[in-house]
Amino acid sequence: MIMSSTMSTEAALVPNESVFDTVSSFNEDDANYSVLDLYDDDDEGDDSSTVERKEILTTRELEKAKAFTSLIMADPENFDRYGFSKKGYFISQEEYDKWWTEYNRYTERRKKKWENFLLKNKIELHNDNPLVYPARTDELSKFVRKGIPAEWRGNAWWYFAGGQRQLDANVGVYDRLKSDCREGAVSGKDMEAIERDLYRTFPDNIHFHKESFQNGEPAIIRSLRRVLMAFSVYDKTIGYCQSMNFLVGLLLLFMEEEKAFWMLVIITGKYLPGVYESDLEGANVDQGVLVLCIKEYLPEIWSHIESSYMNGNGSTDQISGPASGEEYLCRLPTLTLCTASWFMSCFVGVVPIETTLRIWDCLFYEESHFLFKVALGILKLSESEFLESKSQKLFRQYSSYTFGGSNDSDSTFKRLKNKIKTQEEADMEILQVIQNFPKRLLNPNDIFEKVLMKKKVALNGITQEKIDRGREYVAMARNRQRASSRPKERRK
């Protein structure tokens, strides 16, 4: 599976003629390709340089795009190289194009360094898509964190995640699962949920749209359905869970269908265990671990979490001071209403696509602890907006009076008390900051170079071993809480 060379150019990714010829009559053979394969031109015998070939392909693809513009979209330049709309609610197309002009140069420089790095390690490039990578070293980690070339990502993710080992141990399983699905093995509940979510997957991506000239569904939608249904049969403990459609949808842009299936198995079983089960307890455990990390690494935000724990209905009269014991692990703070979805989606839709893909590079190379680093990095970058919110300023002043022993007779205290919102209203204001801030992180380097790649940043102390220990601790704490809250049996 080879991604088209045009994918690394500034040109928007647009269909070529072969796609139009085959889309309407696609069958299960499309399972052997990723969407990117469908845009690959066959230029056997072309001995021109990589740069020259890119320029030729770019011109050719743009000319083809112009011929079919009236059929498929208003302007192909409105879409990025993966088929996503450049324009969003928080980012204009002008902002995107200005950023991309410079970032594209960055990716080209990085790719040349990758090529030299692999050749130095005696690894062949295999038609500009390496199949293997060097042993894990600090140097390789730096390369991954600075971004894997877009056209290499499918094979790189597969290699780093151990996908081939998973496939080799389960030869023929995916085909059998598809056969079982055709025989009615998918539960009615899962089937209904999957069908409902298919066309909700990346509504701003051209590959997931059914165009008027197509007789059937887009190939990627059919692949998405098969993978999700097969997984619901493969792991009945999980079945289908919302957000899986986005995980698989993104994987299908970079790899063939069966590989996308096994990558989903790896994500749900290895990287985020228990997160997608029906009770979502694994998701709650991970949020508890995140709260522990906030307590250790982000004291200003932790101070807000402490002050927000109350004994009653949210009245500001009932602020109780620092959260006691393990309460915050069992009654998770409000901000986890946002951050839980960050983990379940692996940041798909949380940050712009280039930033998402850089996060995925590191997820598959470094495992799930990197998701915690990213979450903390986003919170750190948004900290100033978080703390500058009007309600936070008032709460800090109010808390200083409350814990300082002031009473209702204090005139300043009374004025603050009248101005301040309820804790629920304050939390909603904070949630809006946390929800909106990451959507502006168009440039991956804004979080990677400013926070995640700095040598002296405390977040470097977060390892996979530390996260796994945290998961065990939080799970036990939550189990203790549940056990203590059960009514005791009466003695006979």
UniProtKB/Swiss-Prot annotation:
GO cellular component, one term: mating projection tip
InterPro entries associated with the record: Rab-GAP-TBC_dom, Rab-GAP_TBC_sf, Rab_GAP_TBC_domain
Highest taxon above the source species: Eukaryota
Misc remark: Present with 1730 molecules/cell in log phase SD medium.
Domain Rab-GAP TBC stretches: 147-367
SMART domains: TBC
GO terms assigned for molecular function: GTPase activator activity
Keyword hit for Transcription: no
Protein's GO biological process: establishment of cell polarity; establishment or maintenance of actin cytoskeleton polarity; exocytosis; formin-nucleated actin cable assembly; vesicle targeting
Keywords: Cytoplasm, GTPase activation
Name under which the protein is recorded: GTPase-activating protein MSB4
Name of the gene: MSB4
Subcellular location: Cytoplasm; Bud; Bud neck
Function: Regulates exocytosis by functioning as a GAP for SEC4. Also required for efficient polarization of the actin patches.
